[in-house]
Amino acid sequence: MTDARQRAAEAQTLIADLLKATIKAGAEAADAVYHESRSLSAGVRMGQPEDVESSESRDLGLRVLMGQRQACVSTTDFSPAALHELVERAISMAKAAPEDKFTGLPDPSQLATEAVDLDLFDGVELEMPQLLERAKAAEAAALAVLGVTNSEGGGAGRSFGVVAYANSIGFSGAGWSGSHTVSATAIAGKDTAMERDWDYEAKTHFSDLPSPEEIGRKAGERAVRRLNPRKLESAAMPIVFDPRVATSLVGHFASAINGAAVARGTSFLKDRLGQQVFAAGIRIIDDPLRKRGFRSRWFDMEGVRRQTRDLVEDGRLTTWLLDCATARQLGRASTGHAARGTASPPSPAPTNVYLAPGQKTPRELMADIKHGLYVTELIGMGVNGVTGDYSRGAAGFLIVDGEIAEPVSEITIAGNLKDMFLHLTPANDLEFRFGTDAPTVRIDGMTVAGR
Protein backbone atom coordinates (compact mmCIF):
# COMPACT_ATOMS: atom_id res chain seq x y z
CA MET A 1 0.00 0.00 0.00
CA THR A 2 2.91 2.33 0.78
CA ASP A 3 4.31 1.66 -2.68
CA ALA A 4 0.92 2.51 -4.22
CA ARG A 5 0.74 5.84 -2.42
CA GLN A 6 4.31 6.62 -3.36
CA ARG A 7 3.73 5.79 -7.03
CA ALA A 8 0.64 8.02 -7.08
CA ALA A 9 2.49 10.89 -5.39
CA GLU A 10 5.37 10.60 -7.86
CA ALA A 11 2.90 10.66 -10.75
CA GLN A 12 1.25 13.81 -9.44
CA THR A 13 4.61 15.53 -9.06
CA LEU A 14 5.60 14.53 -12.59
CA ILE A 15 2.50 15.95 -14.27
CA ALA A 16 2.45 19.05 -12.05
CA ASP A 17 5.99 19.90 -13.18
CA LEU A 18 5.01 19.18 -16.78
CA LEU A 19 2.05 21.57 -16.59
CA LYS A 20 4.20 24.33 -15.11
CA ALA A 21 6.64 23.94 -17.99
CA THR A 22 3.79 23.91 -20.50
CA ILE A 23 2.26 27.17 -19.26
CA LYS A 24 5.72 28.76 -19.02
CA ALA A 25 6.34 27.78 -22.65
CA GLY A 26 3.27 29.73 -23.80
CA ALA A 27 0.22 27.47 -23.53
CA GLU A 28 -2.97 29.26 -22.50
CA ALA A 29 -4.27 26.20 -20.65
CA ALA A 30 -3.35 22.54 -20.35
CA ASP A 31 -4.03 19.26 -18.63
CA ALA A 32 -2.10 16.03 -18.28
CA VAL A 33 -2.90 12.42 -17.54
CA TYR A 34 -0.65 9.61 -16.37
CA HIS A 35 -1.31 5.87 -16.58
CA GLU A 36 0.83 3.16 -15.01
CA SER A 37 0.08 -0.54 -14.88
CA ARG A 38 1.70 -3.83 -14.07
CA SER A 39 0.15 -7.25 -14.41
CA LEU A 40 0.93 -10.92 -14.11
CA SER A 41 -1.17 -13.76 -15.53
CA ALA A 42 -0.94 -17.51 -15.89
CA GLY A 43 -2.87 -19.86 -18.14
CA VAL A 44 -2.81 -23.65 -18.11
CA ARG A 45 -4.35 -26.35 -20.27
CA MET A 46 -4.63 -29.97 -19.21
CA GLY A 47 -2.48 -29.17 -16.20
CA GLN A 48 0.41 -27.71 -18.17
CA PRO A 49 1.43 -24.03 -18.33
CA GLU A 50 0.37 -22.53 -21.64
CA ASP A 51 0.36 -18.73 -21.28
CA VAL A 52 2.58 -16.95 -18.79
CA GLU A 53 2.63 -13.19 -19.15
CA SER A 54 4.09 -10.25 -17.29
CA SER A 55 3.69 -6.65 -18.37
CA GLU A 56 4.54 -3.18 -17.12
CA SER A 57 3.79 0.16 -18.74
CA ARG A 58 3.93 3.89 -18.05
CA ASP A 59 2.34 6.42 -20.35
CA LEU A 60 1.82 10.16 -20.10
CA GLY A 61 -0.49 12.41 -22.12
CA LEU A 62 -0.49 16.20 -22.45
CA ARG A 63 -3.31 18.33 -23.84
CA VAL A 64 -2.58 21.95 -24.73
CA LEU A 65 -5.34 24.50 -25.32
CA MET A 66 -4.78 27.72 -27.25
CA GLY A 67 -8.09 29.56 -27.24
CA GLN A 68 -10.53 27.12 -28.79
CA ARG A 69 -7.83 25.02 -30.38
CA GLN A 70 -6.37 21.92 -28.77
CA ALA A 71 -3.80 19.20 -29.36
CA CYS A 72 -3.02 15.97 -27.53
CA VAL A 73 0.37 14.26 -27.47
CA SER A 74 1.70 11.32 -25.48
CA THR A 75 4.99 9.71 -24.54
CA THR A 76 6.52 6.78 -22.70
CA ASP A 77 9.87 8.57 -22.42
CA PHE A 78 10.09 10.57 -19.19
CA SER A 79 13.55 12.04 -19.66
CA PRO A 80 13.80 15.85 -19.34
CA ALA A 81 14.71 16.21 -23.00
CA ALA A 82 11.74 14.10 -24.13
CA LEU A 83 9.30 16.02 -21.93
CA HIS A 84 10.65 19.35 -23.21
CA GLU A 85 10.13 18.16 -26.77
CA LEU A 86 6.63 16.96 -25.85
CA VAL A 87 5.67 20.42 -24.61
CA GLU A 88 7.04 22.18 -27.69
CA ARG A 89 5.29 19.74 -30.02
CA ALA A 90 1.95 20.03 -28.23
CA ILE A 91 1.99 23.84 -28.33
CA SER A 92 2.95 23.86 -32.01
CA MET A 93 0.19 21.39 -32.88
CA ALA A 94 -2.42 23.31 -30.87
CA LYS A 95 -1.63 26.54 -32.71
CA ALA A 96 -2.22 24.77 -36.03
CA ALA A 97 -5.36 22.85 -34.98
CA PRO A 98 -8.84 23.86 -36.19
CA GLU A 99 -11.04 25.77 -33.78
CA ASP A 100 -13.65 23.89 -31.78
CA LYS A 101 -16.07 26.11 -29.87
CA PHE A 102 -16.84 23.31 -27.42
CA THR A 103 -13.22 22.76 -26.36
CA GLY A 104 -12.07 23.86 -22.93
CA LEU A 105 -11.36 22.95 -19.34
CA PRO A 106 -14.18 22.80 -16.77
CA ASP A 107 -15.41 25.76 -14.80
CA PRO A 108 -13.39 25.82 -11.55
CA SER A 109 -16.62 25.47 -9.55
CA GLN A 110 -17.06 21.97 -11.01
CA LEU A 111 -13.72 20.63 -9.82
CA ALA A 112 -13.47 17.86 -7.25
CA THR A 113 -11.98 19.12 -4.00
CA GLU A 114 -12.10 16.21 -1.56
CA ALA A 115 -10.33 12.91 -2.15
CA VAL A 116 -12.33 9.79 -1.29
CA ASP A 117 -10.77 6.48 -0.24
CA LEU A 118 -12.60 3.88 -2.30
CA ASP A 119 -10.62 0.85 -1.06
CA LEU A 120 -9.51 -0.29 -4.51
CA PHE A 121 -6.24 -2.06 -3.68
CA ASP A 122 -5.53 -4.63 -0.98
CA GLY A 123 -1.75 -4.82 -1.37
CA VAL A 124 -1.88 -8.54 -2.27
CA GLU A 125 0.33 -9.34 -5.26
CA LEU A 126 0.59 -13.07 -5.93
CA GLU A 127 3.67 -14.37 -7.71
CA MET A 128 3.69 -16.58 -10.80
CA PRO A 129 3.92 -19.97 -8.98
CA GLN A 130 0.85 -19.06 -6.93
CA LEU A 131 -1.07 -17.96 -10.02
CA LEU A 132 -0.18 -21.18 -11.82
CA GLU A 133 -1.46 -23.23 -8.89
CA ARG A 134 -4.73 -21.30 -8.87
CA ALA A 135 -5.16 -21.74 -12.62
CA LYS A 136 -4.48 -25.48 -12.30
CA ALA A 137 -6.95 -25.79 -9.43
CA ALA A 138 -9.71 -24.11 -11.44
CA GLU A 139 -9.13 -26.33 -14.45
CA ALA A 140 -8.89 -29.50 -12.35
CA ALA A 141 -12.21 -28.72 -10.69
CA ALA A 142 -13.83 -28.26 -14.10
CA LEU A 143 -12.40 -31.55 -15.41
CA ALA A 144 -13.65 -33.36 -12.30
CA VAL A 145 -17.29 -32.66 -13.18
CA LEU A 146 -18.99 -35.77 -14.57
CA GLY A 147 -19.51 -35.32 -18.32
CA VAL A 148 -16.64 -32.89 -18.88
CA THR A 149 -14.29 -34.40 -21.44
CA ASN A 150 -11.82 -31.64 -22.23
CA SER A 151 -10.67 -28.21 -21.25
CA GLU A 152 -9.87 -24.95 -22.94
CA GLY A 153 -7.87 -24.03 -19.89
CA GLY A 154 -7.79 -22.33 -16.55
CA GLY A 155 -6.37 -18.93 -15.78
CA ALA A 156 -5.43 -16.64 -12.93
CA GLY A 157 -4.04 -13.14 -12.82
CA ARG A 158 -3.50 -9.98 -10.85
CA SER A 159 -2.91 -6.37 -11.81
CA PHE A 160 -2.14 -2.98 -10.31
CA GLY A 161 -2.54 0.47 -11.79
CA VAL A 162 -2.11 4.16 -11.02
CA VAL A 163 -4.00 7.01 -12.70
CA ALA A 164 -3.15 10.66 -12.12
CA TYR A 165 -4.68 13.78 -13.66
CA ALA A 166 -4.01 17.49 -13.27
CA ASN A 167 -4.96 20.68 -15.09
CA SER A 168 -3.79 24.27 -15.17
CA ILE A 169 -6.80 25.63 -13.27
CA GLY A 170 -5.88 24.05 -9.98
CA PHE A 171 -6.94 20.41 -9.92
CA SER A 172 -4.61 17.51 -9.16
CA GLY A 173 -5.74 14.02 -8.23
CA ALA A 174 -4.52 10.44 -8.31
CA GLY A 175 -5.80 7.00 -7.54
CA TRP A 176 -4.63 3.42 -7.57
CA SER A 177 -6.42 0.10 -7.94
CA GLY A 178 -5.79 -3.59 -8.22
CA SER A 179 -7.58 -6.69 -9.46
CA HIS A 180 -7.49 -10.45 -9.01
CA THR A 181 -8.98 -12.88 -11.54
CA VAL A 182 -9.65 -16.59 -11.96
CA SER A 183 -11.28 -18.32 -14.94
CA ALA A 184 -11.98 -21.74 -16.38
CA THR A 185 -13.48 -23.00 -19.65
CA ALA A 186 -14.76 -26.57 -19.88
CA ILE A 187 -15.84 -28.80 -22.76
CA ALA A 188 -18.45 -31.53 -22.31
CA GLY A 189 -19.49 -34.33 -24.65
CA LYS A 190 -17.57 -35.83 -27.56
CA ASP A 191 -17.30 -35.98 -31.34
CA THR A 192 -19.89 -33.63 -32.90
CA ALA A 193 -21.94 -33.39 -29.71
CA MET A 194 -19.67 -31.14 -27.69
CA GLU A 195 -20.55 -28.02 -25.74
CA ARG A 196 -18.39 -25.48 -23.94
CA ASP A 197 -19.01 -23.01 -21.14
CA TRP A 198 -17.01 -20.95 -18.70
CA ASP A 199 -16.87 -19.06 -15.46
CA TYR A 200 -14.84 -15.97 -14.63
CA GLU A 201 -14.49 -13.91 -11.50
CA ALA A 202 -12.66 -10.65 -10.90
CA LYS A 203 -12.39 -8.64 -7.69
CA THR A 204 -10.34 -5.70 -6.49
CA HIS A 205 -9.65 -7.57 -3.24
CA PHE A 206 -8.26 -11.09 -3.14
CA SER A 207 -10.38 -11.97 -0.10
CA ASP A 208 -13.58 -11.30 -2.09
CA LEU A 209 -12.72 -13.80 -4.83
CA PRO A 210 -14.42 -17.23 -4.82
CA SER A 211 -12.08 -20.21 -4.68
CA PRO A 212 -10.60 -21.51 -7.95
CA GLU A 213 -12.34 -24.82 -7.25
CA GLU A 214 -15.76 -23.15 -7.12
CA ILE A 215 -15.11 -21.28 -10.36
CA GLY A 216 -13.92 -24.42 -12.15
CA ARG A 217 -16.87 -26.47 -10.89
CA LYS A 218 -19.34 -23.87 -12.19
CA ALA A 219 -17.67 -23.91 -15.60
CA GLY A 220 -17.89 -27.69 -15.79
CA GLU A 221 -21.49 -27.89 -14.63
CA ARG A 222 -22.55 -25.22 -17.10
CA ALA A 223 -20.91 -27.06 -19.99
CA VAL A 224 -22.60 -30.37 -19.07
CA ARG A 225 -26.02 -28.70 -18.79
CA ARG A 226 -25.73 -27.55 -22.40
CA LEU A 227 -25.33 -31.05 -23.87
CA ASN A 228 -27.80 -32.29 -26.50
CA PRO A 229 -29.49 -28.98 -27.29
CA ARG A 230 -32.57 -28.79 -29.47
CA LYS A 231 -33.78 -26.09 -31.82
CA LEU A 232 -36.89 -24.03 -31.17
CA GLU A 233 -39.76 -23.28 -33.46
CA SER A 234 -39.96 -19.59 -34.39
CA ALA A 235 -42.43 -17.70 -32.19
CA ALA A 236 -42.95 -14.70 -29.95
CA MET A 237 -42.35 -15.59 -26.31
CA PRO A 238 -41.07 -14.25 -22.98
CA ILE A 239 -37.30 -14.26 -22.69
CA VAL A 240 -35.42 -14.40 -19.40
CA PHE A 241 -31.82 -13.19 -19.49
CA ASP A 242 -29.30 -14.74 -17.12
CA PRO A 243 -27.29 -12.06 -15.25
CA ARG A 244 -24.24 -12.94 -17.35
CA VAL A 245 -26.02 -11.62 -20.45
CA ALA A 246 -28.49 -9.19 -18.86
CA THR A 247 -25.53 -6.88 -18.26
CA SER A 248 -25.31 -6.33 -22.02
CA LEU A 249 -28.76 -4.70 -21.98
CA VAL A 250 -27.52 -2.19 -19.41
CA GLY A 251 -24.50 -1.64 -21.62
CA HIS A 252 -26.70 -0.86 -24.64
CA PHE A 253 -28.62 1.64 -22.53
CA ALA A 254 -25.42 3.32 -21.33
CA SER A 255 -24.22 3.63 -24.93
CA ALA A 256 -27.53 5.21 -25.93
CA ILE A 257 -27.26 7.96 -23.30
CA ASN A 258 -23.61 8.71 -24.01
CA GLY A 259 -23.37 12.44 -24.67
CA ALA A 260 -21.23 11.96 -27.77
CA ALA A 261 -23.92 9.80 -29.43
CA VAL A 262 -26.69 12.16 -28.34
CA ALA A 263 -24.82 15.22 -29.65
CA ARG A 264 -24.24 13.47 -33.00
CA GLY A 265 -27.89 12.47 -33.18
CA THR A 266 -26.94 8.78 -33.44
CA SER A 267 -28.80 7.49 -30.37
CA PHE A 268 -32.28 5.99 -30.40
CA LEU A 269 -32.86 7.78 -27.07
CA LYS A 270 -31.67 11.22 -28.24
CA ASP A 271 -35.12 12.83 -27.83
CA ARG A 272 -36.22 10.95 -24.72
CA LEU A 273 -34.69 12.89 -21.82
CA GLY A 274 -37.23 13.19 -19.01
CA GLN A 275 -39.52 10.63 -20.65
CA GLN A 276 -40.58 7.12 -19.70
CA VAL A 277 -38.12 4.69 -21.30
CA PHE A 278 -38.52 1.80 -18.84
CA ALA A 279 -41.51 0.53 -16.88
CA ALA A 280 -42.49 2.37 -13.71
CA GLY A 281 -40.33 1.35 -10.76
CA ILE A 282 -37.18 0.69 -12.77
CA ARG A 283 -33.96 2.32 -11.57
CA ILE A 284 -30.55 2.36 -13.24
CA ILE A 285 -27.73 3.84 -11.20
CA ASP A 286 -24.25 5.07 -12.07
CA ASP A 287 -22.06 4.90 -8.96
CA PRO A 288 -18.46 6.12 -9.34
CA LEU A 289 -18.01 6.14 -5.55
CA ARG A 290 -18.75 2.47 -4.84
CA LYS A 291 -16.10 0.99 -2.61
CA ARG A 292 -14.12 -1.76 -4.37
CA GLY A 293 -15.81 -0.95 -7.69
CA PHE A 294 -13.90 -1.62 -10.90
CA ARG A 295 -14.65 1.82 -12.35
CA SER A 296 -14.64 3.80 -9.13
CA ARG A 297 -12.83 7.14 -8.94
CA TRP A 298 -13.68 10.36 -7.12
CA PHE A 299 -12.74 12.58 -10.07
CA ASP A 300 -13.17 12.25 -13.82
CA MET A 301 -10.51 12.86 -16.46
CA GLU A 302 -11.22 16.59 -16.51
CA GLY A 303 -11.02 16.93 -12.73
CA VAL A 304 -14.79 17.23 -12.31
CA ARG A 305 -16.19 15.88 -9.04
CA ARG A 306 -18.19 12.70 -9.34
CA GLN A 307 -21.38 11.65 -7.62
CA THR A 308 -23.78 8.73 -7.59
CA ARG A 309 -26.66 9.37 -10.01
CA ASP A 310 -29.94 7.76 -10.98
CA LEU A 311 -29.75 7.52 -14.76
CA VAL A 312 -33.28 6.14 -14.75
CA GLU A 313 -35.67 6.89 -11.91
CA ASP A 314 -39.09 5.23 -11.78
CA GLY A 315 -38.62 4.35 -15.44
CA ARG A 316 -37.82 7.92 -16.58
CA LEU A 317 -34.55 8.92 -18.23
CA THR A 318 -33.04 11.63 -16.03
CA THR A 319 -29.68 12.50 -17.58
CA TRP A 320 -27.08 11.98 -20.28
CA LEU A 321 -23.49 10.90 -19.61
CA LEU A 322 -21.50 14.07 -20.31
CA ASP A 323 -17.99 15.41 -20.33
CA CYS A 324 -17.36 19.14 -20.70
CA ALA A 325 -17.36 19.22 -24.50
CA THR A 326 -20.58 17.24 -25.00
CA ALA A 327 -22.20 19.19 -22.15
CA ARG A 328 -21.47 22.45 -23.99
CA GLN A 329 -22.84 20.99 -27.22
CA LEU A 330 -26.08 20.04 -25.48
CA GLY A 331 -26.38 23.16 -23.34
CA ARG A 332 -25.93 21.30 -20.07
CA ALA A 333 -23.31 20.81 -17.35
CA SER A 334 -20.76 18.01 -17.21
CA THR A 335 -21.94 15.01 -15.23
CA GLY A 336 -18.38 13.97 -14.37
CA HIS A 337 -18.15 11.21 -16.95
CA ALA A 338 -15.03 12.28 -18.85
CA ALA A 339 -12.75 9.35 -19.65
CA ARG A 340 -9.45 9.63 -21.42
CA GLY A 341 -6.44 7.81 -22.70
CA THR A 342 -3.13 9.58 -23.09
CA ALA A 343 -3.25 10.33 -26.82
CA SER A 344 -6.75 11.73 -27.29
CA PRO A 345 -9.07 14.32 -25.75
CA PRO A 346 -11.71 13.34 -23.17
CA SER A 347 -14.96 11.63 -24.12
CA PRO A 348 -17.92 10.45 -22.00
CA ALA A 349 -18.01 6.97 -20.49
CA PRO A 350 -20.06 5.33 -17.71
CA THR A 351 -18.63 4.29 -14.36
CA ASN A 352 -20.16 1.48 -12.24
CA VAL A 353 -23.59 1.16 -13.86
CA TYR A 354 -26.20 -1.26 -12.60
CA LEU A 355 -29.87 -2.11 -12.92
CA ALA A 356 -31.45 -2.04 -9.46
CA PRO A 357 -32.97 -5.36 -8.35
CA GLY A 358 -36.69 -6.02 -8.35
CA GLN A 359 -38.87 -7.81 -5.80
CA LYS A 360 -39.19 -11.32 -7.24
CA THR A 361 -36.72 -14.18 -7.18
CA PRO A 362 -35.66 -15.50 -10.60
CA ARG A 363 -37.89 -18.52 -10.02
CA GLU A 364 -40.88 -16.29 -9.24
CA LEU A 365 -40.08 -14.13 -12.25
CA MET A 366 -40.57 -17.05 -14.63
CA ALA A 367 -43.26 -18.94 -12.67
CA ASP A 368 -46.11 -17.96 -15.03
CA ILE A 369 -44.20 -18.62 -18.27
CA LYS A 370 -45.78 -21.57 -20.07
CA HIS A 371 -43.34 -21.52 -23.00
CA GLY A 372 -40.31 -19.27 -23.00
CA LEU A 373 -36.56 -18.99 -23.33
CA TYR A 374 -33.83 -18.63 -20.71
CA VAL A 375 -30.77 -17.08 -22.38
CA THR A 376 -27.28 -17.81 -21.07
CA GLU A 377 -25.19 -16.83 -24.11
CA LEU A 378 -25.43 -14.11 -26.74
CA ILE A 379 -23.54 -14.19 -30.03
CA GLY A 380 -22.70 -11.38 -32.42
CA MET A 381 -23.29 -7.65 -32.18
CA GLY A 382 -26.55 -7.13 -34.06
CA VAL A 383 -27.59 -3.95 -32.27
CA ASN A 384 -28.33 -0.71 -34.13
CA GLY A 385 -27.61 2.20 -31.82
CA VAL A 386 -29.45 4.66 -34.07
CA THR A 387 -32.77 2.81 -34.34
CA GLY A 388 -32.62 0.46 -31.35
CA ASP A 389 -33.15 -2.60 -33.55
CA TYR A 390 -31.88 -5.70 -31.77
CA SER A 391 -31.06 -9.11 -33.27
CA ARG A 392 -28.53 -11.50 -31.76
CA GLY A 393 -27.70 -15.17 -31.85
CA ALA A 394 -28.46 -16.92 -28.58
CA ALA A 395 -28.26 -20.17 -26.65
CA GLY A 396 -29.79 -21.22 -23.38
CA PHE A 397 -32.68 -23.30 -22.10
CA LEU A 398 -36.34 -23.77 -22.78
CA ILE A 399 -38.73 -22.62 -20.05
CA VAL A 400 -41.74 -24.94 -19.67
CA ASP A 401 -44.46 -24.25 -17.10
CA GLY A 402 -42.20 -21.94 -15.14
CA GLU A 403 -39.26 -24.34 -14.96
CA ILE A 404 -35.94 -24.34 -16.81
CA ALA A 405 -35.99 -27.40 -19.07
CA GLU A 406 -33.84 -28.71 -21.92
CA PRO A 407 -31.00 -26.77 -23.58
CA VAL A 408 -31.53 -24.96 -26.88
CA SER A 409 -29.11 -23.45 -29.39
CA GLU A 410 -28.82 -22.03 -32.91
CA ILE A 411 -31.55 -19.46 -32.36
CA THR A 412 -31.88 -15.73 -32.90
CA ILE A 413 -33.71 -13.36 -30.60
CA ALA A 414 -35.01 -10.06 -31.95
CA GLY A 415 -36.86 -6.93 -30.92
CA ASN A 416 -36.28 -3.21 -30.53
CA LEU A 417 -34.53 -1.86 -27.46
CA LYS A 418 -37.17 0.85 -27.02
CA ASP A 419 -39.87 -1.81 -26.64
CA MET A 420 -37.60 -4.19 -24.75
CA PHE A 421 -36.77 -1.58 -22.13
CA LEU A 422 -40.46 -0.78 -21.58
CA HIS A 423 -41.25 -4.47 -21.02
CA LEU A 424 -38.24 -5.28 -18.85
CA THR A 425 -38.70 -6.71 -15.34
CA PRO A 426 -35.69 -7.35 -13.05
CA ALA A 427 -35.38 -10.10 -10.45
CA ASN A 428 -33.86 -9.62 -7.01
CA ASP A 429 -30.53 -11.42 -7.55
CA LEU A 430 -28.22 -8.50 -8.36
CA GLU A 431 -24.54 -9.10 -7.64
CA PHE A 432 -21.77 -6.55 -8.21
CA ARG A 433 -19.26 -8.45 -10.30
CA PHE A 434 -18.02 -6.13 -13.04
CA GLY A 435 -18.30 -2.49 -14.09
CA THR A 436 -21.75 -3.08 -15.58
CA ASP A 437 -24.13 -5.28 -13.60
CA ALA A 438 -27.71 -6.52 -13.70
CA PRO A 439 -29.89 -9.14 -12.03
CA THR A 440 -31.84 -11.75 -13.95
CA VAL A 441 -34.15 -9.91 -16.36
CA ARG A 442 -37.42 -10.87 -18.04
CA ILE A 443 -38.66 -9.27 -21.26
CA ASP A 444 -42.03 -10.22 -22.72
CA GLY A 445 -43.00 -10.14 -26.38
CA MET A 446 -39.65 -10.73 -28.08
CA THR A 447 -39.32 -12.80 -31.24
CA VAL A 448 -37.37 -16.05 -31.30
CA ALA A 449 -36.28 -17.35 -34.71
CA GLY A 450 -35.37 -21.02 -34.79
CA ARG A 451 -35.97 -23.70 -37.33
Describe the function of each predicted region.
Residues M1-R451:
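N-terminal small-residue-enriched
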